[in-house]
Amino acid sequence: MFRGATLVNLDSKGRLAVPTRYREMLNGESQGQMVCTIDLHQPCLLLYPLPEWEIIEQKLSRLSSMNPAERRVQRLLLGHASECQMDSAGRLLIANTLRQHADLKKEVMLVGQFNKFELWDEQTWYQQVRDDIDAEQSTQEPLSDRLQDLSL
């Protein structure tokens, strides 16, 4: 399970160093093989260990290519999916097209989200956190049953 937000740097080749606390887990779970794709709703990237991505691919394969909305989701997620292999120094090369999509510069936030990571431009991440907190404080919407059951 991945959790927490960590500031990492992209080098001049577009590689990021995976924090050491995740490297052993990723090497054991996926031999360092990862898949990176776009997020459909946020200006960030999604980074999955290969076994987790294969579950997503199975779900995508069950969508109908005859349904326009389902086909769009397939096209966006699969069409942007890029395999990344963690090297011996624990670095992942993020494809240039993906870096451009999320406007990733030198400072990148690696955000653990259970079975995957999100990759955010640092400033965009902090703005998103502020926006999320503001939305939670000002929302008039009733909580879903699942959120009502969540006790922190």
From Swiss-Prot:
The entry describes its oligomerization and partners as:
Forms oligomers.
A Gene Ontology annotation in the biological process aspect, one of them, is: negative regulation of DNA-templated transcription initiation
Cite a GO CC annotation. Answer: cytoplasm
Cited InterPro entries? MraZ, MraZ_C, MraZ_dom, MraZ_N, MraZ_sf, SpoVT-AbrB_dom, SpoVT-AbrB_sf
Residue stretches making up the SpoVT-AbrB domain:
5-52, 81-124
Residues that span the membrane, as ranges: none
Q: Which family does it belong to?
A: Belongs to the MraZ family.
**Protein name per the record:** Transcriptional regulator MraZ
Q: Name one Pfam family in it.
A: MraZ
Keywords from UniProt, A to Z, are:
Cytoplasm, DNA-binding, Repeat, Repressor, Transcription, Transcription regulation
Organism annotation: Pectobacterium carotovorum subsp. carotovorum (strain PC1)
